[in-house]
From Swiss-Prot:
Component of the endosomal sorting required for transport complex III (ESCRT-III), composed at least of VPS2, VPS20, VPS24 and VPS32. Interacts with SKD1. Interacts with BRO1/ALIX. This is Vacuolar protein sorting-associated protein 32 homolog 2. Belongs to the SNF7 family. It comes from the Eukaryota. It holds the Pfam family Snf7. Component of the ESCRT-III complex, which is required for multivesicular bodies (MVBs) formation and sorting of endosomal cargo proteins into MVBs. The ESCRT-III complex is probably involved in the concentration of MVB cargo. Residues 10-41, 117-176 form a coiled coil. GO terms for biological process: intralumenal vesicle formation; protein transport; vacuolar transport. Its main location: other.
């Protein structure tokens, strides 16, 4: 009698603690997923920069790291799905336990009133409960099966992805408006080097005589 009185609250407390722990783990996985997605996006931007710098090897390395981050994101998604399944099963099991307890209380009330119990019905109920428990155990074992494998990368596929990034970058550059070339700076004239002055040409004898005649006529 004492076990029935104090055992049930303890089981409910354990179930609530387990649900809280699963919720905390789920939130932690979601935060890690956001961080990995941010890192994957950063690797794509690095790949573009290396591609513009004609550093193809470094760009491919960035794409490899991006693939690794994406693989971890996918794995975290599977973990989150398993936790959701576990929470659903735990809540279902808790509801089942409460339902069974209610049925047992009803059976006790019926026994007090009728002073009789149909053992066949009890056996049938227990068989159904045992069957449900076994099915739930098999589902949990199936979900707990470890998974994961090392990622193999196809160099040709990575090169094709890099070519696609380069094409997108080239297209974005072609769509930008053309800019005018800056004017060339003026070259200062070194000190001491002034432009050459025209040298007066020497007059001929005829030109001197003509000039003298014009001067006399002016007088």
């Amino acid at each position: 009698m004492m076990n029935r009185l104090f055992g049930k609250p303890k089981q409910e407390a354990n179930a609530l603690q387990t649900l809280d722990k699963l919720n905390e783990t789920l939130e932690m996985l979601e935060k890690k997923e956001k961080v990995l997605l941010k890192k994957a996006g950063a690797e794509v931007e690095k790949a573009k920069e290396y591609s513009r710098a004609k550093n193809k090897r470094a760009a491919i390395q960035c794409l490899k790291r991006k693939r690794l981050y994406e693989g971890q994101v996918e794995q975290l998604g599977n973990f989150q799905l398993r936790i959701h399944d576990q929470m659903i099963m735990l809540e279902g099991a808790k509801a089942t336990t409460e339902t069974v307890d209610a049925l047992r209380s009803g059976a006790s009330a019926m026994k007090a009133m009728q002073k009789a119990t149909n053992i066949d019905d009890v056996d049938k109920t227990m068989d159904e409960i045992n069957e449900q428990t076994e099915n739930m155990k098999q589902i949990q074992e199936a979900l707990a099966t470890p998974m994961g494998a090392a990622a193999d990368f196809d160099e040709d596929e990575l090169a094709a992805e890099l070519d696609e990034l380069e094409s997108e970058e080239l297209e974005s550059q072609l769509l930008q408006p053309a800019t005018t070339a800056p004017p060339l700076p003026s070259v200062p004239v070194p000190a001491g080097r002034q432009p050459a002055r025209p040298v007066p040409q020497k007059r001929t004898a005829e030109e001197e005589e003509l000039a003298a005649l014009q001067a006399e006529m002016a007088l």
